[in-house]
Amino acid sequence: MSITVNKKAFHDYFVEEKYEAGISLEGWEVKAIRAGRMNIKESYVIIKGGELFLIGMHISPLATASTHVSHDPTRTRKLLLHAKEISKLIGKVERAGYALVPLDLHFVRGRIKLEIGLAKGKKQHDKRADELDKDSKREAQRAMKERQR
């Protein structure tokens, strides 16, 4: 079940591979995510010391959250993947010029998972071409719908 989708990532990048990663979260963050109080639009993944970290994901604390814990809505969160997956991703990002972008936040058996994509950036003309393709498909669907009436 998807919690939130980063639509901007598909607009700005060509996503070539997808990986599912766990996230190291605190209790108040899990409650806030379950309530839908997060944003992954401006977030990105970095590699530091052979580990992956999610930066810029904003989680707003609930009003009923604990007062004795300091809440940092945009703290850096560690991503949890298998060592083989991490080494493969590090190799591609460092050599081939790929970027790691968060695509989707969802539940798997009660656990919160983040789908990250191995992606290459789109140029402005690529974005325009994609927009034209979407428009033509939309027009074709509209014409088919009108024809059936």
Curated annotation (Swiss-Prot):
Its main location: cytoplasm. Belongs to the SmpB family. Transmembrane segments: none annotated. HAMAP family: SmpB. InterPro entries: SmpB (IPR023620), SsrA-bd_prot (IPR000037), SsrA-bd_prot_CS (IPR020081). The lineage of its organism: Bacteria, Pseudomonadati, Pseudomonadota, Betaproteobacteria, Rhodocyclales. This is SsrA-binding protein. GO terms for cellular component: cytosol. Residues 121-149 are annotated as: Disordered. It is found in: Cytoplasm. NCBIfam families: PRK05422.1, smpB. GO terms for molecular function: RNA binding. Required for rescue of stalled ribosomes mediated by trans-translation. Binds to transfer-messenger RNA (tmRNA), required for stable association of tmRNA with ribosomes. tmRNA and SmpB together mimic tRNA shape, replacing the anticodon stem-loop with SmpB. tmRNA is encoded by the ssrA gene; the 2 termini fold to resemble tRNA(Ala) and it encodes a 'tag peptide', a short internal open reading frame. During trans-translation Ala-aminoacylated tmRNA acts like a tRNA, entering the A-site of stalled ribosomes, displacing the stalled mRNA. It comes from the Bacteria. Pfam families: SmpB. GO terms for biological process: trans-translation. Keywords: Cytoplasm, RNA-binding. PROSITE patterns: SSRP (PS01317). Residues 127-149 have a biased composition (Basic and acidic residues). The keyword Transmembrane does not apply. Gene3D superfamilies: 2.40.280.10.
